[in-house]
Swiss-Prot record:
GO terms for biological process: translation. One of its GO terms (cellular component) is cytosolic small ribosomal subunit. Keywords: Cytoplasm, Ribonucleoprotein, Ribosomal protein, RNA-binding, rRNA-binding. The gene is rps4. Belongs to the eukaryotic ribosomal protein eS4 family. It comes from Xenopus laevis. It comes from the Eukaryota. This is Small ribosomal subunit protein eS4.
């Protein structure tokens, strides 16, 4: 019987959105334990080597990290398998580049570059609120931050804006109909739209109905909804495509149009 934590991850069993091919090796980097789940994170090594192509091998990634060039959410990270996840800000001081991990419409983490101004904050979904010892109110966010003394109006499923330097809450958005949201799980992963209504199902999962900018309607569980803006004004810059998923036919037409204009 195996004792203790698992230390390996086979390539075939790695999450599909990492986009690792089956034939280049047997193993994949197993993410360290951290603020995001294994199936919902992107290890630093995959981001630097496979996405940005700043290194060819894992050894080179280690050399980059060990020089303390890479910051995630304003903190230097030297662990190459550190699990970066949704909404994390990855900064590379040396090149002056900043990235925010957000999903594209195919449910993969997009390489989304942001300005140094935008890299100063991140949005977090409130997972849980409670009153601790001596009556101190706490809240826990989707990236495992515990914040004490929050605004009493902030409830579960709301989104808070955090200043990365101080770790303090600067603003918040209520979970409400008419607000812009991004889907962070399920079949509609990566789609962005405005919340139209919420079906309450006591004892089961609440269902949220969302309408995207093209007028398409879809529904998902409440746990998959991440509010990213008040009204239809997003608080973060959106990746290419603005979270609108095209049908296969629409994608084909778009590709052909691009081909004709270039050819």
């Amino acid at each position: 019987m195996a004792r203790g934590p698992k230390k390996h991850l086979k390539r075939v069993a790695a999450p599909k959105h990492w986009m690792l091919d089956k034939l280049t090796g047997v193993f994949a980097p197993r993410p360290s334990t951290g603020p995001h789940k294994l199936r919902e994170c992107l290890p630093l090594i995959i981001f630097l080597r496979n996405r940005l192509k700043y290194a060819l091998t894992g050894d080179e990634v280690k050399k980059i990290c060990m020089q303390r060039f890479i910051k995630i959410d304003g903190k230097v990270r030297t662990d190459i398998t550190y699990p970066a996840g949704f909404m994390d800000v990855i900064s590379i001081e040396k090149t002056g580049e900043h990235f925010r991990l957000v999903y594209d419409t195919k449910g993969r983490f997009a390489v989304h570059r942001i300005t140094s101004e935008e890299a100063k904050y991140k949005l977090c979904k409130v997972r849980k609120t409670w009153v601790g010892t001596k009556g101190i109110p706490h809240l826990v966010t989707h990236d495992a931050r515990t914040i004490r003394y929050p605004d009493p109006l902030i409830k579960v499923n709301d989104t808070i804006q955090i200043d990365l330097e101080t770790g303090k809450i600067t603003d918040f958005i209520k979970f409400d109909t008419g607000n812009l949201c991004m889907v962070t799980g399920g079949a509609n992963l990566g789609r962005i739209g405005v919340i139209t209504n919420r079906e309450r199902h006591p004892g089961s999962f609440d269902v949220v109905h969302v309408k995207d900018a093209n007028g398409n309607n879809f529904a998902t569980r409440l746990s998959n909804i991440f509010v990213i803006g008040k009204g239809n004004k997003p608080w973060i810059s959106l990746p290419r495509g603005k979270g609108i998923r095209l049908t296969i036919a629409e994608e084909r037409d778009k590709r052909l149009a691009a081909k004709q204009s270039s050819g």
